[in-house]
Amino acid sequence: MSHKLVLVLNCGSSSLKFAVIDALTGDDQISGLAECFGLEDSRIKWKVNGQKSEASLGAFTAHREAVEYIVNDILGAHPEIAAEIQAIGHRVVHGGEKFTRSVIIDESVIHGIEDCATLAPLHNPAHLIGIRAAQASFPALPQVAVFDTAFHQTMPEKAYIYALPYKLYRENAIRRYGMHGTSHLFISREAAAALGKDEADTNIICAHLGNGASVTAIKGGKSVDTSMGLTPLEGLVMGTRCGDLDPSVIFHLVNRLGYTLDEVESVLNKQSGLLGISELTNDCRGIEEGFGSGHKGATLALEIFCYRLAKYIASYTVPLERLDAVVFTGGIGENSDLIREKVLNSLAIFNFNVDKERNAAARFGNGGQITTDEGTVAMVIPTNEEWVIAQDAIELIK
């Protein structure tokens, strides 16, 4: 069988996820993570055909050294895989309004990603470092950028414009952009197939739930509304992010309580959400354990998380007009039968009837319908953003 292999790179501020994916099947040939960049113990872990390995990258190394290690040591040890790589696919968090679809990277694309860096200051600069490193290591291979924001560029103006002076949008592009677009796109395609429908005739609400979380209304395969905004801070309760908030809270923290703006930003992004409410952990597994043992903070955090999510799902029936299914994905969405059941029970008005056996079975990579055959469909579909990136890369280089 012929392969169409793509090296997928996902560069964070202090880490780099990588995988060699077969765009035809979605199978990983190689997958791994380099982390702790800039520290004394930078390391890289990887897996080839199920066999795990680990190595030190050396002190204070970063993206370039990680890419070089991937090329020289990992791929160098597997020339049969390296020889079949046809493109490099890069995940890019923010493409602003400039990038409405995946693109082959050239200098103009790099400048465009740089221009969007103020909208994703932790992510876009890291992506650019990864792109430059990959260009140096793979000068003969085409490089493709796949944007988290691109899928949401089909939202109508009434969904993405904030009720601020319009010139802030016109002159500064302040608007809702949304994130997790690659995941929501994958789920849109997979949900239509699972329902036996054409994607253009499928309306779903997708809940991507992880440490970062977002909900998207998808009508006929296109995003029509999403919960994250200008940045990933808006919307749902998340691991450490507050989600929706009265903006005057910021003024109160600064003017009355003496916080600096940097401190406020840290509170809203890194100290809030499940962690802030529970005063215990940002990890949903720990929250569920606390809920089970009667921990007051964990119980409150879980209740608020589920309540906010249920409200968003209910509100996103408005732009859809008809709902074919609610789909849960992401680390929490794929594994927490407790949260799924609590959320769907709150949406009984929409005729969701949770099948406890199906719901309990949909964990650890197992998906499928979690409601009874009577009533509205809810299902679990494990996401695969890397596969979408690989598919887009191969499609663009045809």
From Swiss-Prot:
Pathway: Metabolic intermediate biosynthesis; acetyl-CoA biosynthesis; acetyl-CoA from acetate: step 1/2
Amino-acid positions noted as binding substrate in the UniProt annotation, renumbered to this chain: 91
Cofactor(s) in the UniProt record: Mg(2+); Mn(2+)
Gene3D superfamilies for this protein: 3.30.420.40
UniProt remark on cofactor binding: Mg(2+). Can also accept Mn(2+).
Assembly behavior: Homodimer.
Protein name: Acetate kinase
